């Protein structure tokens, strides 16, 4: 293969690519490679560019199979018609560790053997795998705690408390609470899974967001009143047209208002404020904003970026005491994302919190 053609093809590729000659020196590198590994890569020994023994061994094997000690055992053979190796490794790139999928392939050249090294960033895959591991671990923990308690109470009921009606009633009440907690968790997990699976499909139903918000406020008014909290809806006396999934948007505002009553009810009032936005830059057009405001104790700023993570809680014990699963705001985030909207969270300790959902404005009436 002609040198000029190789350099031209490598330069056009979007992923980092290096070409190594028979002397194990880099003779071509594209812009993506220099951005990842540093400037002035050409004419350098390959071992000084990518210091990973498995990759270096694969390059040596393809350049000179007869003199190489052995093929790298921890790389998968194949991946190119001319023969090669593939492996997922962690490389050092500009002072940081980067999980990468490396493909090393033979590159026939007019002046002798050469090797092509392709580097694909796999950090996204690694992050997804780790997120899945964390998710499974969190679910296991959340289910194990009430299950362990219930098993303990069952053993007690079969033993010391068998003939104690008062203890039996007390333990059965606790078991009912723990079972309800597990049921809420399972329902939220199913809801989150369903929302995530639908996130790429934008809903097209036309509805009146103002009417929906007022219905949520009415539904939760008795629960709030029992806790000494008043729910008040402000703004937008007329129609508030949006395109959306009525059930999912009801779930969004139900979660937000319920949280405001539970955690911010000390202020005695929760306000739902509906406002029109003439033009939202990120949504590229008119929008509607619904702010759920409480006058409670507020949330420290360091927690705000993580509130929509699965199972993230500001206060684990308090959340569990109030029946929280740690999934409500994650569900809210995904539903709002499906509606091509955004969620804004503002809070100051001692001053309350404001959760604002901003959705693109629809046309016509709901």
Q: Where in the sequence are the language-model features?
A:
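Short helix N-cap motif at coil->helix boundaries in the Bergerat
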Residues: 209, 298-306
């Amino acid at each position: 293969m002609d040198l000029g053609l190789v350099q031209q093809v490598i330069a056009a590729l979007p992923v980092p690519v290096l070409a190594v000659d028979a002397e194990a020196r880099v003779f071509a590198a594209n812009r993506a490679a220099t951005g990842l590994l540093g400037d002035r890569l050409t004419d350098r020994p390959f071992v000084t560019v990518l210091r990973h023994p498995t990759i270096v061994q694969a390059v040596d094997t393809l350049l000179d199979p007869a003199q190489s000690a052995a093929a790298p055992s921890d790389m998968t053979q194949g991946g190119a018609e001319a023969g090669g190796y593939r492996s997922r490794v962690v490389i050092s790139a500009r002072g940081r560790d980067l999980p990468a999928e490396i493909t090393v392939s033979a590159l026939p050249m007019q002046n002798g053997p050469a090797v092509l090294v392709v580097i694909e960033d796999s950090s996204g895959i690694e992050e997804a795998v780790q997120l899945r591991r964390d998710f499974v671990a969190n679910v296991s923990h959340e289910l194990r705690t009430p299950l362990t308690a219930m098993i303990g109470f069952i053993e007690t009921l079969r033993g010391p408390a068998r003939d104690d009606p008062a203890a039996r009633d007390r333990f059965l009440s606790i078991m009912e609470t723990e079972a309800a907690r597990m049921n809420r968790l399972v329902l939220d997990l199913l809801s989150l899974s369903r929302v995530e699976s639908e996130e790429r499909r934008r809903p097209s139903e036309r509805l009146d967001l103002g009417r929906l918000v007022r219905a949520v406020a009415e539904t939760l008014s008795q629960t709030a009143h029992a806790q000494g909290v008043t729910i008040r809806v402000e703004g937008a006396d007329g129609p508030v047209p949006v395109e959306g999934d009525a059930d999912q948007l009801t779930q969004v505002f139900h979660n937000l208002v319920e949280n405001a009553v539970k955690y911010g009810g000390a202020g005695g009032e929760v306000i739902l404020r509906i406002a029109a936005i003439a033009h939202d830059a990120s949504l590229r057009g008119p929008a509607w904003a619904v702010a759920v405001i409480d006058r409670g104790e507020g949330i420290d700023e360091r927690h705000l970026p993580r509130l929509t993570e699965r199972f993230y809680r500001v206060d684990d014990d308090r959340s569990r005491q109030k029946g929280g699963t740690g999934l409500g705001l994650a569900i809210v985030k995904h539903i709002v994302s499906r509606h091509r909207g955004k969620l804004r969270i503002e809070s100051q300790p001692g001053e309350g919190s404001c959760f604002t959902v901003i959705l693109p404005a629809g046309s016509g009436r709901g």
